[in-house]
Amino acid sequence: MFQIRSFLVGISAFVMAVLGSAAYSAQPGGEYPTVDDIPVGEVRLYKIGDGVWSHIATQKLGDTVYSSNGLIVRDADELLLIDTAWGAKNTVALLAEIEKQIGLPVTRSISTHFHDDRVGGVDVLRAAGVATYTSPLTRQLAEAAGNEVPAHSLKALSSSGDVVRFGPVEVFYPGAAHSGDNLVVYVPAVRVLFGGCAVHEASRESAGNVADANLAEWPATIKRIQQRYPEAEVVIPGHGLPGGLELLQHTTNVVKTHKVRPVAE
């Protein structure tokens, strides 16, 4: 079990009227919010460390509800947002929660790959005055997929192994994994690594949605992350519960198992 302090999202907070005005209570016992705790259309914040929060939202696909993680990082008197909250409605709720619970403006965002759980809501951010960033490849893939497209390219993130400092974080393009364009974000001040969908939670036994994955390259990509951030203390996956560096090896194991599963079947 990793130890991180929770950011209580309010004793009797309400989602904005436009979102349905549903009440929710603070997370008991400092537990990380799960899919069972968050109705679709609402967002929870969880404090990871000084000036760093995860944001957690849910979305229903078919008959199943999934949770999704993003990150909020303080940058002086502003906030940097890592990933949307998976859709316009959720992202409106996210901005409302940030205003309510943190009270600082979100001025910039980074999307870590082109899927809707990372870029869905970019138009909401843009309308709110947030400068939206991602890699050149993510912009290209998002446009090709008909997804929302962040406005600005981090042109230094063009090839596997590229890294750029962006305010209080380091953004690393480790190579193809869950998607060809997935980025990871490291907050050195608190040793928090946001692995996004390149990294799985500990309970995950399947590689999940691999429609755009590169299963052959994924283990090597994880190895690059391990080599670059051996000092990371908290690792946040794209979906599910945070952990430590063990999540990286776990992800490799899951991906390798997925690769051989069709042969066994």
Curated annotation (Swiss-Prot):
Residues 1-17 form the signal peptide. It catalyses: a beta-lactam + H2O = a substituted beta-amino acid. Its cofactor is Zn(2+). InterPro entries: Beta-lactamase_class-B_CS, Metallo-B-lactamas, NDM-1-like, RibonucZ/Hydroxyglut_hydro. GO terms for cellular component: periplasmic space. It is an enzyme of class 3 (hydrolase). It is found in: Periplasm. Monomer. The class B beta-lactamase family has a specific amino-acid numbering system known as BBL, for standard numbering of class B beta-lactamases. A multiple sequence alignment was used to derive a consensus sequence and then the consensus was numbered taking into account insertions and deletions. This allows use of identical numbers, e.g. for active site residues, despite differences in protein length. UniProt always uses natural numbering of residues, hence there appear to be differences in numbering between this entry and some papers. This is Metallo-beta-lactamase VIM-7. It comes from Pseudomonas aeruginosa. The gene is VIM-7.
